[in-house]
Each structure stands twice: as structure tokens, then as C-alpha cells.
Amino acid sequence: MGRRAWIRPDVCFVAFASLMGMACLVLTPPFQVADEPNHFFRIVQIAQGGIVGERRGAESGGEIPVALVSMAGHFIDGNMASGEVRWERSRWANVRPYLQQRADLTATRFQDFRAMTRYAPVAYLPQLVGIWFAEALNLPPLWLVYIGRFCALVFFI
């Protein structure tokens, strides 16, 4: 490519979006973005065939594998609803099992993610592809998060 080809806006966008997107994908700790745990739970629910959220009393959500709820809890320190969340680096010391050991995704429990049940499944299509891919390869649970993020980035670009 000549020098002028790199100056085109579409090429600059793809290059910059790829670079910055990968930086955000890798450098942002799991579940530290607003509502990420709840969006993740909604994606998992849809990936398992739960198109419509369940209503149980005042809560709305769905059946989510206990291993994934436990993983999200490992990374959340504080109150997500109020925004009082702190990320402690010491949590990375115990992250290895979530990256290396496969989890039993058959045991489930009801998880409340009420604000996300309103979103249509089509909004989560890029992440769904990532979750299905990771589940098909029987990857450890944290890979579901990162592959879902990667598919959303690719779809955006």
C-alpha cells in the first residue's frame, strides 16, 4: 500500500479501533465495567436458550451456571449498583483457576439481572457467538468473558 492508502479515514479507523479495542479488552479487569456482570449473565441465559427472562417476585433474571456466578463474585468487590466497586490487584493471584480449569456448567441457580431482561437477544448476537464458541471448545469460564468481548470488538470494527 502506498502512503496515501493509510491516510484514508476507513483504514485509520480500523487501525485505531483495533489497537484501542484490544487494549481495552485486555487491560480492563473482568466485570469492572458498569453492568458487565448482568450483561454477561443475560448473554449466558440466551446462549442456553433462555430468550425471555424469568420473573420471580420482584426479581427478573434466569438460570445461570453456579460456576459463572461464583466467578463473577470473585471479581466484584463492593456494591455494583451504587458504583462503589474497588478492584484489588490481589484478586489476580487467585485468577488462575478461572483461566485454566474447566468448570461444571450444569449446576444452575436463579440469578437476578432485572434491567437486562428487557434487551432483545439480537443485541447480544456478537457476544453469543463468542460464548457458543468458547462453550463448544469447553474452555475455562473466564475465557467466555474474553472471547465474548473479542467478538463484540470485531463486530464493532
Describe each PLM feature range.
Residues 8, 32, 36, 111-119, ...:
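Aromatic-acidic/polar surface patches that form glycan- and anion
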Residues 9-12, 27, 104, 111-112:
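Alpha-helical hydrophobic/aromatic positions enriched in membrane-embedded helices and signal peptides
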Residues 15-22, 129, 154-157:
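Generic alpha-helical transmembrane segments of integral inner-membrane proteins
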Residues 30, 38-42, 48:
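Extreme N-terminal leader/anchor segments
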Residues 49-147:
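Interfacial juxtamembrane loops and adjacent helix segments
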